[in-house]
Amino acid sequence: MALYIILLFAALCAGMALSVCAFGTGGKRKHIFRDIYFSVEDTDGIGVLYTKTGEYSAVLKIENPVQKYCADIDSYYEFTQLFTALAQTLGEGYALHKQDIFVRRRFAEETGGDREFLSEAYFRYFEGRPYTDSMCYLTVTQEAKKSRLFSYDGKKWRDFLMKIRKVHDQLRDGGVQARFLNKAEASEYVDRYFAMDFKNRIVSMTNFRADEDTVSMGGKRCKVYSLVDVDYAALPSLIRPYTNIEVNNTEMPVDLVSVIDNIPNADTVVYNQVIFLPNQKRELSLLDKKKNRHASIPNPNNQMAVEDISRVQEVIARESKQLVYTHFNMVVAVDADTDLQKCTNHLENAFGRMGIHIIKHAYNQLELFVGSFPGNCYALSEEYDRFLTLSDAAICLMYKERVQHSEETPLKIYYTDRQGVPLAIDIT
């Protein structure tokens, strides 16, 4: 009898050990940042991020092709065509994660050196003037098959290397400045996102505290605003890559989401734009099933759903459009003593005027923040954080503009830009 009791106790202990290994102890949230990356490796000068779930990612630093305040409608449509071509090049099993980062800085002349009195007085006049700087990164991620014991596949790895080089070439041919981050730069980029610090030379980490409304870190707080609520998709039926603003009684086109680069009280804003590329045949089959399910119950709401799905199927059949899953969010970082409600009101009012109602109950702040790490986009929930739409509509919600930076030239002439800070212009 004693032997049976000992065997039963040993079996229970073994079962508990297996359960802890497979499902954890319930404290995974405490170690959530440790479970993102496996390593960062250098592959022919390209820094490749490996996640612990088996995805590969390469990061390109790019410059958006549309000059801010250029008033050129065609350039916004050219951006849409370029990223549509990138999505078609990558195909099933890939994701595009574009991060536009806006940082409030204070002007400081970096060159130094001996100057004449007037030059010294000129730069001293602008010293400390606040302005918004921007940078843009594009991460290409290959999805890993979660059902396999060993996820490495040499053929898929070679396909990944080929596809990321094709993306780089397409961006260059489209007039977009792009280069791959190497191992050190990719590691630094991840660290800067983790600390939400894109302006200090030295990045320091600190403790995190996450609740249902914010993520706090040291002397700053972050709030993640998800753009689309999958339970209540309040989006306009027709969308363009630009919108019009009135300037001196004249309409001028600007980026559709240009409101995110001037959020009041915001110190840093990261606009995450993720496009997942699924199997097209499977998604069309699921759309057919969904349409039949709505058609089986005749009421006005179901009839509207059937008509919407039919229009989408017609566009796909006629114009060979691509179905994609998307996710858009904004990570807004402010000082710890700053009220975030002003940022919330600004975003709700600005997007509300465009017919877009941002989600009001994004209580999974930590999960959204972690899912927005470069290369970790597949950690976003398929059920709650991804929205099915056409690729053209998704790309319209991307940020397309760039601010002008000083040109690298030995002979510099300085002019002030629209933010009132000096820029070096090449006149050679």
Residue ranges and their predicted role:
Residues 401-428:
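Active-site-adjacent "gating/activation" loops or surface patches in catalytic cores
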